[in-house]
Swiss-Prot record:
It is an enzyme of class 3 (hydrolase). It comes from Leishmania major. It catalyses: O-phospho-L-tyrosyl-[protein] + H2O = L-tyrosyl-[protein] + phosphate. This is Protein tyrosine phosphatase PRL-1. The gene is PRL-1. Its main location: cytoplasm. Optimum pH is 6. The keyword Hydrolase applies. A lipid is attached at C172 (S-farnesyl cysteine). Pfam families: PTP-SAK.
Length: 175
């Protein structure tokens, strides 16, 4: 059984060879494929798994393998809530600060999943591309859709095109 995963790298525009974040967009695991899913997360070096849908599996099994699980659900087809947005950016800021404090710390791989991996998970990754990079909202959507067909609906696209960045800085690209 294969895990449906799409890797997107966020790189520093001042130094494009420097990866700030690896994002892994996924669909939700089920109890039956959770062992395979966990192996894939470990193989990819995932340190954080962000679940933006309702629980479909026992998160303690993932946590027992050294992966932090963040459960920040929001409505299917909708943009993230303010609380989810704040939690997501706080996680990314914390990981970026770790790298700045110790340049030998490798960039984190952060898994993000919703039910199908087409709406809620990709919109958070698109937000990271916009927020931490010099990537426009439409370019972020196009980059994600190039790798993950059908990602991000019209409601989410409209929201991210109106989004105002909080940060100035690093750039993100698909590798």
């Amino acid at each position: 059984m294969e895990v449906n995963a799409t890797l997107i790298d966020c790189c520093d525009p001042q130094k494009p060879s420097r990866v700030l974040f690896h994002f892994l967009i996924l669909d939700a695991p089920s109890p039956s494929n959770l062992p395979t899913y966990i192996k894939e997360l470990q193989h990819r070096g995932v340190r954080h798994l962000v679940r933006v849908c309702g629980p479909t599996y026992d998160a303690t099994l993932v946590k027992s393998r050294g992966i932090d699980v963040h459960s920040w659900p929001f409505d299917d087809g909708a943009p993230p809530t303010r609380a989810v947005l704040d939690s997501w950016l706080k996680l990314l800021d914390t990981e970026l600060a770790r790298q700045q404090e110790d340049p030998s710390v490798p960039p984190p791989t952060i898994g993000v999943h919703c039910v199908a991996g087409l709406g809620r998970a990709p919109i958070l990754v698109a937000l990271a591309l916009v927020e931490y990079g010099n990537v426009s909202a439409l370019d972020a959507i196009a980059l994600i859709r190039e790798k993950r067909k059908g990602a991000i609906n019209q409601t989410q696209m409209h929201w991210i095109t109106k989004y105002k960045r909080r940060h100035q800085g690093a750039g993100c690209v698909i590798m």
